[in-house]
Amino acid sequence: MRISTPEFIALMAMLVATVALSIDGMLPALPHIAAQLSPESPNQAQLILSSFVVGMALGTFVMGPLSDSFGRKRIIYFGAGLYVLSATVCMMATSLETMLFARLLQGIGAAGPRVVSHVLVRDLYSGREMARISSFIMIVFALVPAMAPMLGAGVMIFFEWQAIFAVMSPRRSLRAN
């Protein structure tokens, strides 16, 4: 069964937007995470963002070739699974080191669907249609960093910082299906 173009655009935009949500959505929680996981040196908690970005960078290099070898769908599922598992570890982290390692893996996991979504657009469309679809996806990618901190702050109003990672887990696994 082939999905419609609007559904495809929405799915690809959500996969790409996960990266921005994973970084910007947790910004309101950073002081709380620092207070709990590294109270003696709260500035080290900023490494939580860096480790995700490093994971994304590493994952970006390998996920494209892996999707050529093993198939697009498998890499999307693998990346989404790693992302969800890592978000769960982040949620339960009791040390900064555990959090940093989990965020590194989460970045690698996020890279899979992000890279494959761009590849799928190029696989399925060309010319002006590809440019049009890519522009819709990039509009969403550009808007999400502005909205993600508000989402994170909204979660922090009602719950502890771990809830931000709990929100990341089911959201991502639903998108993979």
What are these regions (language model features)?
Residues 7-39:
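Extracytoplasmic
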